[in-house]
Each structure stands twice: as C-alpha cells, then as structure tokens.
Amino acid sequence: MKRMIPIALGVLALAGGAFAQNSPEIDRPLAAAPANMAKDATVIKWKADGTYDTLKKGTNKLVCYDRSDLPGRPAFAVQCTSTANLDRVAQNRKFDMIADKDAHQKAIDDAEKNGTRVKPEYGSVWFSMNGPDQEHARMHVTIALPGATTQSTGLPDNPRQGGAWIMAAGTTTAHLMTPGH
C-alpha cells in the first residue's frame, strides 16, 4: 500500500497537466477569437523591438495578441487575424508608437505613397475587442480589402447609404465595415 501512494500521486500529477488551463497571458488575447477557432489559434506576445514570442502554437491560420500596451489603447485591447498579416501588424505597431497624432498619420501616408506599406492578406478578417475591461469590451470585425474602391466592389466608401461600406478605399488599409457593434 505504501508503494501505491507515490505511484498514484505521480499519475495524478501527470494527468493534472493534461487538464491545465491556459495562462491569462494566453486566454486574454483569445477573447477576440471566434469560439470555433480559438482552440487552434496561435497566441503571440509582441516585444518592443517589433518581434514576438509565441506563447501557444496553433494549427489554424488565426493568430491572437494583446495590444493594450500601445499608446491610446484601452486597458483591454486584443486582436486576432490571419498569420499572413503578422508583417502588417508589426508595421502597424511601429506606427502606433508614434504618439503625435499628425506625425502618426503622416508616417502611414508616407508609407502608402512610397510603396513600403505592408499589405494585409486580401479577404482576411480582423477580430478586435476593446474596452476598459473584458466584461465591457466590444467586438469590432473588419475584412481587409487592400486596394479596393467603390468602382472595384460596387460598395460605397461611406456609411451614409446604410449597409456595408469600404473604409480607406483605394489604400492598403481599405477594409469592409459593417454597421452595428
């Protein structure tokens, strides 16, 4: 019997790892992921130098990350998108570190003009969740349509007509907006 106790404790210790919960550092970014994709999503943590550490390797194309460290973001700010957009996200983070609003926009405009603006994957979805905390955060979903215009899509470039519309038409930032929260 005395030999059985250490063996039983060892088995329980090993089995406990199989049922362990994710850390808050992983669960927090996954809040923005669609339920049917979250389990298989990759989770990364951005570093100040524009690189990232992989906290959880996923098996689908969705990558999620916390962005509440960026200037002007609320206390709870997480986002998920296609792994194909990581270079775009890195560039966005670089621009977001520019505190002055006018200088920030000028840096983006200059990159658009000189062709160095990284394009997102056409048709990729961006799931963003922002608010003072997770309980009060709101979802915002957009679909990247780099270069899309009203002529190429037939969609308006403003929300006044109702329905879906293209924001930032004709740029690499062009994306489909939908009404609602």
Predicted feature residues:
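Intrinsically disordered, low-complexity, hydrophilic segments
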Residues: I5, F19-A20
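Repetitive helical segments and hydrophobic/amphipathic motifs
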Residues: V11-L12
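Primary mode marks residue(s) on the alpha4-beta5-alpha5 output face of response regulator receiver
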Residues: Q21-H181
